[in-house]
């Protein structure tokens, strides 16, 4: 095999800093969001939602336009075989990305809840960073009675980092507080932090409050 393509999910330096050296070593082309050309030096082609990137002879990745963490963020969805999501910094295991480096929480809500949450439950999640331990702790800070998150935290705190857990969307909906927007316990605890929150807040209100708390947690 050989490297022919470099896929950048977004423009942050920790995701693109190796582009130049990799291109020099392999001659690969750099692909990223169509609107990221002025942010990613040496980008060869821009990707639009719905485009397909072929890897090797058998893997096809659908491009998803997933703004929120930044406004030029893509995720890559593998439909062939077991579905998989390469989610960059939009969706983490048990969490979502921040929005203070070129993003917007209202947009991230629409991406995460109205787009990614609709992927098949057996979709494996491969994020750009492994923050699962800290994210599970935040979930339990917001929803202490979440027994699935309690059990999983105990497991991942002891796991071999070379055999790290891979979650799927079904599990994310149980452990990721940003998908648990109708949880009675989550809402009750939020209302202690935000006394003006309505008794029955909508999902976007809950998401934005959680994102605000997570910014300084």
Residue ranges: model-predicted function:
Residues 110-124, 131-217:
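Accessory terminal helices/loops
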Residues 1-65, 82-83, 151, 155:
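Active-site HxH/HxHxD metal-binding segment of metal-dependent hydrolases
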Residues 102-111:
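Charged helix-capping and loop-helix junction motifs
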Residues 38-41, 94-101, 135:
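A short acidic, helix-capping loop that chelates divalent metal ions and anchors anionic groups
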Residues 31-32, 86-87, 127:
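Hydrophobic residues in well-ordered beta-strands that form the structural core
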Residues 22, 89, 129, 169:
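Residue-level signal for inorganic ion chemistry
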Residues 1-2, 75-88, 94:
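Conserved beta-strand hairpin/beta-sheet module of binuclear metal-dependent hydrolase folds
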Residues 11, 35-36, 69-70, 90-91, ...:
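Active-site metal-binding loops of divalent metal-dependent hydrolases
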């Amino acid at each position: 095999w050989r490297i022919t393509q470099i896929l950048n999910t977004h423009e942050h330096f920790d995701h693109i800093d190796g582009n130049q050296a990799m291109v020099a070593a392999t001659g690969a082309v750099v692909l990223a969001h169509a609107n990221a050309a002025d942010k990613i030096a040496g980008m060869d082609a821009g990707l639009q939602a719905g485009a397909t990137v072929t890897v090797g002879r058998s893997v096809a990745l659908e491009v998803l336009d997933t703004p929120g963490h930044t406004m030029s963020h893509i995720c890559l969805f593998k439909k062939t075989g077991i579905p998989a999501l390469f989610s960059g910094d939009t969706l983490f295991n048990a969490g979502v990305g921040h929005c203070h480096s070129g993003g917007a929480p209202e947009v991230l809500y629409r991406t995460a809840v109205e787009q990614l949450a609709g992927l098949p439950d057996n979709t494996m999640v491969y994020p750009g960073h492994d923050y699962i331990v800290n994210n599970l702790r935040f979930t339990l800070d917001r929803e202490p009675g979440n027994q699935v998150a309690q059990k999983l935290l105990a497991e991942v705190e002891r796991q071999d980092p070379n055999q790290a857990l891979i979650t799927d969307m079904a599990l994310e909906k149980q452990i990721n507080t940003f998908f648990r927007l109708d949880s009675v316990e989550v809402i009750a605890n939020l209302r202690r932090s935000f006394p003006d929150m309505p008794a029955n807040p909508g999902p976007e209100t809950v998401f934005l409050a959680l994102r605000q708390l997570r910014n300084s947690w």
